[in-house]
Amino acid sequence: MNLRHIFILPALLAAMACSDDSPVTPDTPDTPEGPDITNSVEKLVSIDAGQTFQTIAGFGASDCWSPAFVGKSWTSHRAGITELLFSSEIVGGKPKGIGLSQWRVNLGGGSAAQGEASGIEDKSRRAESYLTDDLTYDWTRCEGQRYFMDRAKELGCNNFVLFSNTPPVQYTYNGKGFSARGGLSNLKPEHYGDFAGYMADVAARYTAEGYHISHISPVNEPQYNWDSGQEGSGWTNDEVAALARELD
């Protein structure tokens, strides 16, 4: 049995009340000081590396929302950013990254192509879709997201989860990537099969390109009443079940 001892030394904290006019001059210099926290405390923690309590299948994160922009436009920094996320390499005793083993990929609803007409004011909360208005696929889209997927696989992360915040705008009641129906789905009843087929087609495309798609998550936070703050849709349990059956 190997025991490792870790000594934890908390950082020193300081508190200061500042005025709105000056970031360095307190409004009330005579304000009583807080408790004295200048004394560090040394604690001993013992870790038994030979005892297993659980098995973690994956350590992951999501590409919502910044990677779509970073991967496409931040060409001078994107390689370093992806290395910080996906690298498991140790150099000089220090990790080059956090070694993510799973990556969630947003199947956007197409509000990015709508621009201001999408009704989503914050452009960073709009997303691209491979589905075009004539219901064909444009596989050159989602360039930034595909860059992150490619780098993830290159650096050793090859478990991808596809997820959707909203059906494609071509299939929704209001033609938008957000819902005006409260807790009900924004997906028109006649398009359940189309939406399921779209997700399956994207998964098949990625699989053919060598990405391991371990899961498809067809709805995201379905009990929230999404508005125009970002892409999103509510879903009832019956609606989720109907979509899952189409996707199966």
Spans of model-derived segments:
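Bacterial N-terminal signal peptides that target proteins for export
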Residues: 1-7
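Polysaccharide-binding and catalytic clefts of secreted carbohydrate-active enzymes
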Residues: 219-240
